[in-house]
Design a protein with these regions (language model features):
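A conserved short beta-strand
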Residues: 104-116
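Serine-hydrolase catalytic machinery in alpha/beta-hydrolase-like enzymes
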Residues: 1-78, 82
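Conserved alpha/beta-hydrolase "nucleophile elbow" surrounding the catalytic nucleophile
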Residues: 3-5, 86-88, 137
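Flexible "cap/lid" loop of the alpha/beta hydrolase fold
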Residues: 37-45, 114-132
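Gly/Ala-rich beta-loop-alpha elbow adjacent to hydrolase catalytic centers
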Residues: 87-91, 95
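Active-site signature of alpha/beta-hydrolase-fold catalytic machinery across serine-
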Residues: 14, 97-101
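C-terminal catalytic histidine-bearing segment of alpha/beta-hydrolase fold enzymes
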Residues: 131-133, 146-191
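Short beta-strand/loop motif that positions the catalytic acidic residue
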Residues: 133-136, 140
Length: 191
């Protein structure tokens, strides 16, 4: 699970108790200090959601996340068909990147209250085998639900299966949204 901007791995573990007890959760903290406290995966351009200001930070976060996820999969001998990436906000952007690049090859990606980073839109190749769930709060005051709807449209335009789910709430994980994600993961795990 990948946290949002201004948070850290500890915030993710507060959600772990609400998930299916069979899950093994790996949470990684962003590499960079955030201007709003906590950590972040890359420096965003405040005025343009999805834009990044430092491509090196973005690339380094992708590299470190890929290495950590791969090492963890090897260490616990995980079945790749049961690997899911789940990110919130800026962490959702990174989860989308890892899924689309195809290096990690997860079964599914949950990009909650997130956005598709601009660099992705110029890529030529995508891994189309991963399924995506894009939950977003209807009253999100940080990122409009349009950012997830736009990501869904982009994914589908590349032949990638994506589902948008809107829940009542602001820029946070609600009990309703966590339950929906939990059921989605369980459903895909059985296929």
């Amino acid at each position: 699970m990948l946290h949002g901007r201004g948070a850290g791995a500890k915030t993710i573990f507060s959600v772990e108790g609400l998930l299916d007890p069979g899950y093994h959760v790996l949470a990684i903290t962003g590499l960079y200090n955030s201007a709003i406290d906590g950590k972040e995966w890359f420096k965003p351009r405040e005025e343009i959601p999805g834009e990044i200001t430092d491509a090196k930070q973005f690339d380094e976060s992708e590299r470190v996340l890929t290495e950590n996820v791969e090492a963890h999969i090897s260490r616990v001998r995980a079945d790749r068909s049961k690997i899911f990436l789940w990110g919130f906000s800026q962490g959702a952007a990174m989860a989308l990147i890892l899924g689309l690049r195809g290096k990690v090859k997860p079964r599914g990606v949950v990009a909650m209250s997130g956005f598709l980073p601009t660099p992705v839109k110029i890529w030529k190749k995508f891994d189309t085998n991963t399924q995506y769930l894009l939950p977003h709060g209807s009253e999100d005051e940080v990122l409009s639900a349009e950012s997830s709807k736009s990501a869904k449209s982009f994914l589908e335009s590349k032949g990638i299966e994506a589902e948008y789910y809107e829940y009542k709430g602001r820029h946070k994980m609600s009990l309703e949204s966590i339950a929906y994600v939990n059921n989605w993961i369980l459903r895909l795990s059985e296929i």
